[in-house]
Structures are given as C-alpha cells and as structure tokens.
From Swiss-Prot:
Organism of derivation: Serratia proteamaculans (strain 568)
NCBIfam families for this protein: argP, PRK03635.1, PRK13348.1
Superkingdom classification of source: Bacteria
Gene (UniProt): argP
Keyword Transcription regulation: yes
PROSITE patterns, per the entry: HTH_LYSR
Description of how the protein assembles with itself and partners: Homodimer.
Family, per entry: Belongs to the LysR transcriptional regulatory family.
Alphabetized Pfam families for the sequence: HTH_1, LysR_substrate
Domain HTH lysR-type, first and last residues per copy: 4-60
Keyword terms, alphabetized: DNA-binding, Transcription, Transcription regulation
Gene Ontology terms for molecular function: DNA binding; DNA-binding transcription factor activity
Gene3D superfamilies in alphabetical order: 3.40.190.290, Winged helix-like DNA-binding domain superfamily/Winged helix DNA-binding domain
Identification of the protein by name: HTH-type transcriptional regulator ArgP
PANTHER family reported for this sequence: HTH-TYPE TRANSCRIPTIONAL REGULATOR ARGP, TRANSCRIPTIONAL REGULATOR
Amino acid sequence: MKRPDYRTLQALDAVIRERGFERAAQKLCITQSAVSQRIKQLENLFGQPLLVRTVPPRPTEQGQKLLALLHQVELLEEEWLGNDTGIDTPLLLSLAVNADSLATWLLPALKPVLTDSPIRLNLQVEDETRTQERLRRGEVVGAVSIQPQPLPSCLVDQLGALDYLFVASKGFAERYFPNGVTRSALLKAPAVAFDHLDDMHQAFLQQNFDLSPGSVPCHIVNSSEAFVQLARQGTTCCMIPHLQIEKELASGELIDLTPGLFQRRMLFWHRFAPESRMMRKVTDALLEHGRQVLRQD
C-alpha cells in the first residue's frame, strides 16, 4: 500500500494554495528546488503526475484525492491534539461559499461555532455552481453548492433555497420601464452579473422574456453587496436574494419588477466523510439556521 509522506503532501498543497512554486517555497520556508523535489517524490511514489504545471498550477485527479486526504488528516489531527493536550489550537476550516450566502445567512449561522469553538475560517468565495469543484480539488473541507449529489467519500444535506427577485429602484423603473417590463425595454436596461460565468440574470430573462444570452447590457461586479447598492442608486436592475433586501422592499426603496416571477436556488452543504467533531458542529449550525431563514418547500 502506497503511503505518502505528509511533508511532501504539504508541498503539493502549498503550490495549489499559493498558486505557484515560488510563493509555496516562501510559505514553507524552504527553497523552490526543495518544493519541486518533494512533489517529484510524490509523483514517483504514485507513478503519475499529481500537478498540472499551468499558471496557476492545478492538481490532477489523483492530486485532488491526495489533497482531500491531507485536509481530512490535518483537521482530525489538529482537533485530536487540541482536545488531548488541553491546548485550544485554532482549527483551520477552509470552506467554499457563494457570495450571496456570505452576504445573507451564512455568518449568522456560524456565529455559535465562532463564539464557542477555537477555529480559523478560510472562506473561499465562488459561484454556487462551482463551489463543489473546490471540494473535489481538495482545496476546502466543505462547500455550499447547488449540486444535490455528493462527491465520492462525501456527505451532503439540503440547506434550503434562496429566492432571487428582479428588482430596481422606482426611478429606474420609471426611466426604463414606463410601460411595464417588456422584452424591448429589457434590451436597453443595464443589468449586473457577478462574473462572466454568472448566468442567473440571463437565464431569468431567457426563461420569462425569450431574450438570448448576451442581448442585455450587463456590468460585471464581484460583490453581492454592490448589487444592492447599484440597484438602490438607480443605475441597474438586478437579481438579488429576497432575504438580502427585505428592508428595501418593505420601505419601497426597491421594487419587485416582475411580481410572481423569481429564480429559486436550492442550496446543499457538502463535506468530507467522516466528519470530525468540529465539522459536525459546523454542519449542525448551518442546517439549523438554514431551516430558519431559507425556503424549505
């Protein structure tokens, strides 16, 4: 049975996390040549490449499995050592989350764990359609995703759904939709997307107004909170979670442009199996808060 040296695995992990050999060497306080040698030792042990040497480097499928193993072992080891010695060593938990969850329900959900447990969070923000890939690559130990199916050796639970409304300010609606939201009016109304892979706005318009992708002027802004600000100041129409703008809707600062029409995103919590005690606390906190604030039907 091939048993990797965890020191060499940490070199592979550092190259992925630091996005290159030079920064990985600095992180590990060794030479760049030593990093390369450790990874070569791993590749010789398993008889195949573990790293695709692109910019930035990325792990192969076997490399992903080894990184996932490393993170599981590190989490269990740190937790066990802390509990056994009485030293509250903060556990590093790397989680992949979508920006809208981070801006709405996720941090309140984690408050009990952050208050009562010695952990350090590394929250990696990614679109909910792609967070599971970070778990697959071994970059994180848990992920909030829209994918219902678990990866091999992983667990999954349904969290609940975010409902996205098509909203804008009253002034924006009067300017761009004086006769209501029509197909022709939408072609001139500026919108916003999180990045070039964010297709929620386009999917909503295609489904309800038969508008093809790319037909609507669209800003790219990598901030969930900025969506709200852009809508409030009357410069764009946006797809925003109802949970994020309850006050603005109640006050009339923002209006629902298409009452009865919305996009629903069901969210799922993925993590490696078996769960450590600390990850079980995180899971329980997310599921409990999700049942309270996310749509369950």
